[in-house]
């Protein structure tokens, strides 16, 4: 392939990736119309070529429109303490390397927000965890894939840190915290879970899998999921280590600054948004900030040095936690917590917690 043909192909790849960010990958015809690429070529690129490039598509939910409050939890727990299976509504969980420390991203229905934190206190009281910290997110953002720093043919990042430093602004979809519940039904939850499991799935296929009328499901998708903006965006992610079964080539990193005020958050954000490996960031009302990165092992030293050298103003409040990529999990919308009649529910251990709490009150009355 000549140099001109390579440039032409690369421009088409860039265009397709930018369009996927806007509309997802489930509608090949719409992708074809918006990009001018032949529909069959679009189908091939989405189903085959992205994987060959070491990339994948992640569907991110709009927690605000789902009536959910999101945040970060950092938990200290010994291996002998059984607790992780007791915590629901997580959409990411990971374990620190070389420490009995765990991190989780959660999105819990607004009406359960206080009880959710009470659960963590209950687990600590029962000595099922050693300690915990909750950082409630006022906002979450999913930074966009940065194709200008990616070598598609070599399937790896090619980062010029001088160009990184010149990055201006930020890109990506943001969801804000809202103090309200949302009207979501069982069909909506089924559609969202199916799309998270397989971003290319068609509504007809989802209907067949759950035994629903395709017309009914199309209505729910159009009127609730799409118009209700229940999906925030579809983001292209670097997935080569997972695709090739080489988790040792990936280091996941949590960067956390605590209590630095809004000025400190803004300064830290500017640094983290320049780094092309950042895939999620969030901030609280009280000046906490966190970011999650998927860093190639051959870029770990450079990335850590870049963060440290550009965050001197918040150095005393900065923590960098390295996560074991083999023990990380991305979780879909918790369908099992949704009752078709009652909506979102509390898991059974909360009832156990309430009984113990009632007993304590009776003993002290």
Predicted regions and their residues:
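A compositional/biophysical signature of low hydrophobicity enriched in polar/charged and small residues
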Residues: 1-365
């Amino acid at each position: 392939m000549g140099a001109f043909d390579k440039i032409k192909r690369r421009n088409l790849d860039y265009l397709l990736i930018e369009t996927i960010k806007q509309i997802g990958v489930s509608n090949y015809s719409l992708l074809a119309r918006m990009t001018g690429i032949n529909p069959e070529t679009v189908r091939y690129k989405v189903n085959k070529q992205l994987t060959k490039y070491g990339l994948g598509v992640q569907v991110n939910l709009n927690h605000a429109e789902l009536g959910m409050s999101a945040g970060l939890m950092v938990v200290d727990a010994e291996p002998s303490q059984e607790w992780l299976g007791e915590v629901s509504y997580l959409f990411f969980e990971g374990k620190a390397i070389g420490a009995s420390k765990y991190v989780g991203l959660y999105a819990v229905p607004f009406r359960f927000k206080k009880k959710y934190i009470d659960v963590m206190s209950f687990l600590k009281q029962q000595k099922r965890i050693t300690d915990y910290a909750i950082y409630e997110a006022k906002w979450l953002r999913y930074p966009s894939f940065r194709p200008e720093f990616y070598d598609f043919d070599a399937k790896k990042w090619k980062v010029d840190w001088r160009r990184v430093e010149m990055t201006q602004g930020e890109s990506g979809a943001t969801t804000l915290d809202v103090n309200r519940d949302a009207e979501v039904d069982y069909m909506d939850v089924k559609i969202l879970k199916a799309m998270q499991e397989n971003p290319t799935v068609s509504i007809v296929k989802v209907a067949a899998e759950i035994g629903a009328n395709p017309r009914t499901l199309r209505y729910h998708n159009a009127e609730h999921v799409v118009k209700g903006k229940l999906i925030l965006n579809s983001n292209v992610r670097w997935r080569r280590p997972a695709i090739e079964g080489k988790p040792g080539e990936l280091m996941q990193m949590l960067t956390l600054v605590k209590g630095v005020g809004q000025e400190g958050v803004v300064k830290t954000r500017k640094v983290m948004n320049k780094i092309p490996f950042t895939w999620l960031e969030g901030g609280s009302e009280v000046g906490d900030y966190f970011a999650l990165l998927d860093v190639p092992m051959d870029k770990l030293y450079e990335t850590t040095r870049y963060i440290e050298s550009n965050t001197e103003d918040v150095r005393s409040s900065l923590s960098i936690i390295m996560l074991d990529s083999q023990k990380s999990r991305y979780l879909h919308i918790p369908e099992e917590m949704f009752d078709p009649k009652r909506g979102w529910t509390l898991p059974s251990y909360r009832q156990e917690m309430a009984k113990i709490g009632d007993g304590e009150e009776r003993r002290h009355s």
